[in-house]
Design a protein with these regions (language model features):
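Helical "substrate-binding/catalytic lid" subdomain
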Residues: 2-94, 99-109
């Protein structure tokens, strides 16, 4: 059960990464201060550690090769969850989408 829980944690983290990146993008485009948005979300039911620490989490200042490697690790970490879902006949399209979007989310592509 521990390994299954780890797979599910990776799904939650990666989907939260997508939500954080898209929220940041929309904040920038609409003029909403992202830091203020994070503070508001922190006290709501949509709070997430990934969103709370997004600027540090995505590490935009690191070399692209390092960010690319991190994105690859996150994408690979979703493969076992996708395989398990296929084996038990469960559709998890959000996870499949997250796997494809991770490089964009981490400012690589």
């Amino acid at each position: 059960m521990g390994s299954t829980a780890k797979l599910l944690i990776q799904i939650v983290v990666c989907l939260n990464m997508i939500a954080a990146q898209e929220s940041e993008l929309l904040c920038k485009k609409t003029g909403l201060d992202f830091k203020s948005f994070q503070e508001v979300v922190h006290v709501t039911s949509s709070q997430s550690d990934v969103l709370d620490n997004w600027q540090g989490f995505k590490r935009s200042g690191e070399p692209e090769a390092v960010r690319r490697q991190r994105a690859d690790v996150f994408a690979k970490s979703l493969a076992p969850a996708l395989e398990l879902a296929r084996e038990i006949g469960v559709s998890i399209p959000g996870t499949a989408l997250a796997q494809r979007l991770l490089k964009k989310v981490l400012d690589i592509d």
